[in-house]
Amino acid sequence: MKKFRQIDEGLTWVLEAKSVDDQVGRLKDWASSTQCLVPVVRIGVGAEKVDFGIPEGMPATVKIKEDIPEGMGNTTINLEWRRISGFINPDAPIHNISQARRESVWVQILEGLHHAEAKVLTAVKDGKLLDIYPKLEKMLPTLGITEYNKPKAKRKPKAKKEK
């Protein structure tokens, strides 16, 4: 069983497997040792609709240090899961405080994470995990996830016709 400090490292490892069955096997193996992986994937792909009560995207006030090496963030999504799950549960006390204070707590969580994990957590909050990890989409039917936020297809600009 492989263990990872950061979610982004684990997802990269899962998606390095050649076949979808191997990827699913890796994901299930990893999920058996971490409580937050299943909700992160389900919410991140949009299989579960959750209102975090936070505006979409990375907050403008967040100060994330991009020069920190892998695995060297102050904390991780795993360690912060109790605080993050407060945003997911609609009955949690975090929803009883002002919007500004709630956003401040969210910024504190993001600033403690490694920059790669902060981007993953923001994508999870917005239901756009497939934008960061598009290979994850092939695994979803095998995992029993049929309804999710399909990523927008990137179109190539049409070539201009010459006269």
Locate each region found by the language model.
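N-terminal nucleic-acid-engaging modules of covalent nucleotidyltransferase systems
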Residues: 1-163
